[in-house]
A protein has these predicted regions:
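Helix C-cap/helix->beta junction micro-motif
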Residues: 68-69, 129, 390, 448
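Residue-level detector of anion-binding/catalytic polar loops
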Residues: 70-72, 132, 262, 324, ...
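General beta-strand structural signal in soluble alpha/beta enzymes
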Residues: 20-24, 48-49, 73-77, 83, ...
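C-terminal substrate-recognition/cap domain of FAD-linked oxidoreductases
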Residues: 28-30, 240, 245-437, 455-458
């Protein structure tokens, strides 16, 4: 086994001293996630990965070295939900230097980028050609595409088009032994035709590297499907329902997904807007006092005729269920109009900066913890009621904890639901309330068969693995085939 000094010396030889760090402050900064303090394991060494103008980099060399000496290794993008925390120490690869947008093909409507490319930058490049990713996120430049594919990236457009992983046409992946493979459309790169579809001559293996938490290989390139769309084609609406209308909300969402006319529906509750309304960011005089559920809805329409048809159908469904149109939220918390309120506009208008709901909430509360999972829309009312009851029992159903829901309705008649709780990480009593609540959520969620998206599955106890049955054994066998020394993000799968 090599000493730490020997490991550092070899890494310095591969990438240069400037790109290798063992600074304790760097370790803490790179280790933490959005749930600061939840994962305390630190990397032994941080390596900054950078590519040159021709796309050359040293990832394969680093992996060969790490594999030979059985050194754990994780790849990190921006901040994340915990999957890039180095549970076993070892090497942490900072992928942000592999950030090139390699090709935008307007004719074939795809984009090829390096695995560390900012999703924000990909959108910017696409918009120069009247294109965008069908699923666009609401975040700033820190989020990278490789991480989004590795751990179920989400964004607006899920109601019509699905996850970021559903946009993947091809991948270039570097395996634990340093071998580079191209999958899907990228297997056709270099031919006369070039990339054009995910299906090739062999079985589709893209799924091995999507939602895999970096445990099967390091994503070095991605090829993503884009759609023709200008920002002016996206039209924003918000309908509000009372707390006792959740059953009607559930039925409306199912009907809208079935009709396939809505581009996106974002489901939130009043807790998300409590502090923004108190600060005057949103005028609460223009929002019903009894409004509890907010359905932020986006329509994609290329012309007035298409918009009229889709808008009429959407309004009929919401209004017949008792919903109330609230332009105040649509104008100030959604889309291009929100840019007029500050410098933090599309595509991260509703989260980042002083004009975002999250910035406003944090000023009055503290750090937040979040659970993220998927389940069928027809269980929305049951799951919301269970979460509210758990939060009340734990003493966190109040403005000080802002126990909000922030969820995406998907094309699979499902909801990608995030339960938030804001808390004081330096108050043991508050942390105790948080842990009790998270345990209750884990129990009732596991019992019903949710699909967890964050934090990593290994934090969710034995029930999800038991439900997978022999499939989990097969996945472990595949992992052992491509990474026999289990150096890639150990602990993520086993």
């Amino acid at each position: 086994m090599l000493s730490l000094d020997e490991i550092i010396a070899k890494l310095t030889e591969i990438v240069g001293a400037r790109r290798v760090s063992t600074n304790p402050i760097d370790k803490i900064n790179y280790q933490h996630t959005l749930a600061y303090g939840a994962y305390r394991a630190l990397p032994d060494v941080i390596v900054r990965i950078e590519s040159d103008g021709d796309g050359n980099h040293k990832v394969a060399d680093i992996l060969k070295f790490a594999n030979e000496h059985k050194i754990p290794i994780v790849a990190k993008g921006g901040v994340g939900m915990g999957i890039s925390s180095p549970l076993k120490g070892g090497l942490l690869l900072d992928m942000l230097g592999m950030d090139k947008i390699l090709e935008v093909n307007p004719a074939m409507q795809y984009v090829i980028a390096e695995g560390g490319a900012s999703v924000y930058a990909i959108h910017h490049a696409l918009r120069q050609h009247g294109l965008m990713l069908p699923n666009f996120g609401t975040y700033g430049p820190a989020v990278v595409i490789g991480a989004m594919i590795n751990k179920g990236g989400i964004g607006y457009g899920m109601t019509r088009y699905g996850w970021i992983a559903d946009m993947v046409l091809g991948l270039e992946v570097i395996l634990a032994n340093g071998e580079t493979i191209r999958l899907g459309a990228l297997a056709n790169q270099g031919t006369t035709f070039g990339p054009f579809q995910k299906w090739i001559h062999l079985p589709d293996l893209l799924g091995m590297f999507t939602l895999a938490a970096g445990s099967m290989g390091i994503i070095s390139k991605v090829c993503l499907r884009a759609i023709e769309c200008w920002r002016e084609w996206l039209h924003d609406y918000c309908y509000v329902f009372r707390r006792d209308q959740l059953q009607q909300v559930q039925e409306s969402l199912i009907e809208l997904v079935r009709g396939e006319v809505v581009y996106d529906i974002h489901f939130t509750d009043r807790w998300q807007y409590h502090w923004p309304m108190e600060e005057g960011l949103y005028d609460k005089r223009k929002i019903p006092d009894d409004g509890w559920f907010f359905l932020k809805t986006v329509l994609l329409a290329r012309d007035a005729e298409e918009l009229a048809f889709k808008e009429k159908r959407m309004r009929r469904i919401y209004q017949s269920a008792g919903g109330v149109d609230v332009p105040e939220i649509a104008d100030k918390a959604m889309g291009a109009k929100a840019q007029e309120l500050g410098l933090h506009g599309w595509p991260d208008w509703h989260i980042m900066g002083p004009d975002g709901w999250c910035g406003t909430v944090v000023r009055h509360t503290g750090m937040f913890a979040v659970t993220s999972k998927m389940y069928p829309l027809r269980f929305l009312k049951e799951m919301y009621d269970l979460d509210e009851a758990a939060k009340r029992e734990c003493g966190i159903w109040d403005a000080a904890h802002s126990p909000q829901h922030d969820s995406y309705v998907t094309r699979d008649f499902a909801i990608k639901e995030e339960y938030f709780t804001f808390y004081n990480p330096y108050d043991d009593e508050d942390v105790g309330k948080l842990r009790k609540w998270m345990g209750m959520v884990q129990q009732f969620s596991n019992e019903r068969g949710v699909v967890w998206t964050a934090p990593t599955l290994s934090t969710k106890g034995p029930i999800p693995y038991q439900r997978l049955g022999s499939l989990y054994d097969v996945v472990k066998e595949i992992k052992q085939l491509v990474d026999p020394n289990n150096i890639l993000n150990p602990g993520a799968l086993y």
